[in-house]
Swiss-Prot record:
The gene is hxB. Pathway: Cofactor biosynthesis; molybdopterin biosynthesis. This is Molybdenum cofactor sulfurase. Sulfurates the molybdenum cofactor. Sulfation of molybdenum is essential for xanthine dehydrogenase (XDH) and aldehyde oxidase (ADO) enzymes in which molybdenum cofactor is liganded by 1 oxygen and 1 sulfur atom in active form. The keyword Transferase applies. The lineage of its organism: Eukaryota, Fungi, Dikarya, Ascomycota, Pezizomycotina.
Length: 851
């Protein structure tokens, strides 16, 4: 047994296993369920084994014993420690070949960083082997790293869009005899949907290619396949010329890859131009420029520089641990096949109340989860609501993460597979690229189609509990069980005849983006600018290495950084304090823009996937003082410094939020046709400048809505018996304005979400006018407690069930100073452009609710 946190099959699971034709791992092996190094992983449902599988605690312990019991030197030396490393590397190389049943007389194995590095090694060898260049063909299901080889193929190439095209090309290879060098590459298993391609192509191509001149080589990407299946290279005549893979996909650790070369194809590397340390017998640098490459083996010529010998020695421990835990790859293959079939069937069976499918599954018609030769344990899919609309992949992944479920979403580095499954043409994607679509962004649905997929991939340590957890997650959040009009907004008929009085309960600004709030003191009027409240999100913290703006989603401790504005002393005061601690750190910087500690730098937020402003590139002024950088770096544990983006340098604008008819479009699902007239074309949108806020100058929420949300949270937790409920504070929504109702007047009952009906606002004695731009789309950052920096499940989980429209989770309203206000002659009156706690808020109600 390995540790005390092992997981056992339940009685129901065992009965299900016995009745199935496909067998998972034997029970004696399953009881060796791994304990892992990372704290808390026992509570995690990990379904991203195609990215990397999980490593066993005993693997790390075994490797640690190796390091503490032996002295390993650089293999390029002749010392005893170096020779020990050399012997161990040779032994592991042989063990790796035998793991894939590859005869060392027929094959050589080259250690590389990963499968991509192995692909590039082959591509460079092909390019250097002849001055005429080479022709390159690849299957449409290829990983991006295989696709990239085409840029080195001077003889051109071809993307084969189907298996039939490949078969047709193979059959015609012998028709034309050619001396031109050719390389055909394909994946043994699609990393997108797990479809397995014919391994027989390599032998067919070799047989046909020999008739055509013998210059056709094959490259097999086995990285996805070998994580859960045997790769059998025992028949050298049928094996690929080059096979690439990554060991971390099999064992989780070490981070190492391999290129397995048929020795008969090794001549491809004879003209490789680059040489590194350890690959040559002699090098002349004075006078004659000459070198002699090593000829003893293929790996001696290709492994440039010092090998990662510690990682290779760790691989020996990985082989031993893997065999002890699972016995064989065949056991893992049977185990994952059983679970994948179960998961696929359950997802495929999910239906909404009206019979509509919940999951759109992207499985090849050629594949079958019961047939290991055609399908691996990967499932690619998207979700739809009951009306057939797509649910954004990013929302699903974020909500899953809140439930400790780890999955993958996006195009998965498989451009051909995803575009084909989703129906995108090359012209379509070019158009969407021009519209802003980028790899890793949050553009989930464009032109009515998803831009990526969700992926579940299973591994040796996956069990039925993991399958049940994910399916139950989908059922809880995405299966609509009854036809209801969600109580997202107050219904049309409930707009009160006698409107309630609203007032500003609190005013907050966030001087440093993603850090704590500064609450405007009661009785003090605060300036409002076109960009929002004065000093709001004028600063940010940037990573000193990448220049990316930091945010709470990645660094929750930013909530404990509390800035305040001292107008009397003209300083930004920042404190950092651990919850319950009296040890407070203090920093003050000048509010004056002429601060000599500022230096202009470029901030490219594109590098920050989690930020909603990541499409913008802005220029900020970074503080050069080492003490400023140390203040924030020490507290967050990340190298960062403070930077400023002032109102006079703003080149950012609020996102156009209003979508006339959005609420009507939602209502049309439930009412007879013709109930709503056709909307006129909207007028051109005004541009509202913003600083470093995500989407708009001002964010407003309602106290009544927060109270109602907390009632829903309490009810959900009582219904699910999840323990004592804990209300969320309004602070988690990071609003600038919290509006409350004056219940002393009629009606005396709070009206949650009535702000969804607001079109404009007049605030204060001067009736300062604001436009309501639309609703605020929420992400998992609302789950970070702003007083402790601790991440929770709520309120995002409840919002996902109660505040979703057009497949977006919304709470709060985006606002901006009215354009008419800006153009008034008296706008220079500073007293007019101010707000204060207690100011009366008078809303204008829209006839159409623009969510």
């Amino acid at each position: 047994m390995e540790g005390d946190t092992r997981r056992m099959w339940t009685q129901s699971e065992s009965e299900s296993i016995r009745s199935s034709k496909v067998r998972p791992l034997p029970l004696r092996k399953v009881t060796l369920y791994l304990t892992f190094v990372l704290i808390g992983v026992a509570d995690t449902t990990y379904l991203d084994h195609a990215g990397t599988t999980l490593y066993a605690k005993s693997l790390i312990e075994s490797f640690s014993r190796e390091l503490t019991s032996n002295l390993f030197g650089n293999p390029h030396s002749l010392s005893a420690s170096s020779q020990l490393s050399t012997r161990r590397v040779d032994d592991v190389r042989l063990r790796a070949l035998r793991f894939f049943k590859a005869d060392p007389d027929e094959f050589d194995l080259v250690f590389v960083a990963n499968a991509t590095a192995a692909i590039k090694l082959v591509a460079d060898g092909m390019r250097d082997s002849t001055r005429q260049g080479f022709w390159y063909g690849y299957h449409v299901d290829a990983h991006t790293s295989l696709v990239g080889v085409r840029e080195l193929a001077e003889k051109g190439g071809r993307c084969f869009t189907s298996d039939d095209e490949v078969e047709d090309w193979i059959s015609k290879l012998c028709d034309v005899r050619s001396e031109s060098l050719k390389l055909f590459a394909y994946p043994a298993q699609s990393n997108m949907n797990g479809r397995r391609l014919p391994l027989s192509w390599c032998k067919k191509i070799r047989n046909q290619g020999e008739t055509a001149g013998g210059n056709v080589y094959t490259l097999l990407d086995a990285a996805s396949l070998v994580s859960t299946s045997t790769l059998d290279l025992s028949d050298a005549a049928a094996a690929p010329d080059f096979t690439v893979l990554s060991f971390y996909k099999i064992f989780g650790f070490p981070d190492l890859g391999a290129l397995i070369v048929r020795k008969s194809a090794g001549q491809i590397f004879e003209h490789r131009r680059y040489f590194g340390g350890g690959t040559v017998d002699m090098v002349l640098t004075r006078g004659l420029q000459w070198h002699a490459k090593k000829q003893s083996s293929i790996h001696d010529r290709l492994e440039d520089g010092t090998l990662p010998f510690h990682d290779i020695i760790a691989l020996d421990s990985a082989f031993a641990t893997h065999e002890r835990l699972f016995g064989s790859m065949q056991n893992i293959s049977s185990h994952t096949r059983f679970l994948a079939k179960r998961l696929y069937d359950r997802l495929n069976a999910l239906r909404h109340f009206n019979g509509q499918r919940v999951c759109e599954l992207y499985k090849s018609p050629r594949s079958d989860y019961n047939q290991p030769s055609t399908q691996g344990p990967i499932i690619a899919f998207n979700l739809r609501n009951s009306q057939g609309s797509w649910i954004g992949k990013s929302e699903v992944e974020r909500l899953a993460a809140m439930r400790n479920i780890q999955i993958r979403s996006g195009s998965l580095c498989n451009p051909g597979g995803t575009s084909g499954s989703l129906g995108w043409t090359g012209a379509d994607l070019l158009q969407q690229f021009s519209a802003g679509l980028r790899c890793g962004d949050d553009h989930d649905v464009m032109d009515g189609r998803p831009t990526g997929v969700l992926r579940l991939s299973l591994g040796a340590m996956t069990n039925l509990e993991d399958i049940n957890t994910f399916v139950e997650f989908v059922e809880e959040f995405y299966v609509e069980k009854v036809a209801t009009m969600d109580s997202l907004v107050t219904p049309v008929h409930s707009v009160p005849l006698q409107q309630p009085r609203f007032y500003i309960e609190s005013l907050s600004l966030y001087p440093i983006k993603s850090c704590g709030p500064f609450r405007v003191p009661d009785g003090r009027r605060w300036e409002v600018r076109r960009e929002g409240l004065a000093w709001d999100r004028e600063w940010c913290l940037i990573h000193q290495g990448t220049g990316a703006a930091l945010n709470q989603k990645k660094y929750p401790r930013m909530a404990l950084i509390r800035p305040s504005i001292d107008l009397d002393r003209n300083v930004l005061r920042v404190t950092c304090e651990e919850p319950g601690s009296t040890n407070q750190k203090l920093l003050e910087v000048s509010l004056l823009r002429e601060d000599t500690e500022l230096a202009t730098t470029s901030l490219c937020q594109r590098t920050s996937k989690a930020s909603t402003v990541c499409g913008d590139q802005v220029t900020v002024q970074a503080y050069t003082s080492p003490s400023v950088a140390q203040f924030f770096s020490d507290f967050l544990g990340v190298p960062c410094t403070l930077a400023r983006f002032g109102p006079h340098s703003s080149t950012r604008y609020a996102s156009p939020r209003k979508a006339p008819g959005a609420w009507k479009q939602y209502l049309r699902k439930f009412v007879m046709p013709g109930s709503f007239p056709q909307e006129p074309s909207p007028p051109p949108a005004e541009k509202n400048p913003i600083l470093l806020s995500n989407e708009s100058p001002i964010l407003l929420i309602s106290r009544s809505s927060v109270n109602h949300l907390n009632e829903n949270i309490k009810a959900n937790q009582k219904r699910n018996r999840t323990g004592t409920s804990k209300a969320v504070a309004a602070d988690v929504f990071r609003a600038n304005i919290v509006v409350a109702e004056s219940l002393a007047d009629s009606p005396k009952v709070e009206q949650p979400y009535i702000e969804d009906q607001w079109e404009a606002l007049k605030i204060g004695p001067g009736e300062l006018q604001f436009d309501v731009l639309g609703s605020c789309q929420r992400c998992s950052m609302v789950c970070i407690d702003q007083f402790t920096g601790v991440r929770r499940d709520e309120p995002f989980s409840t919002l996902a069930k109660t505040r979703k429209i057009n497949n977006k989770i919304v709470f709060g309203r985006h606002c901006s100073l009215s354009a008419s206000e800006v153009t008034k002659e008296q706008h220079d009156n500073a007293e007019r452009w101010t707000l204060m706690v207690g100011d009366i808020v008078t809303p204008s109600y829209a006839h159409d609710y623009d969510l």
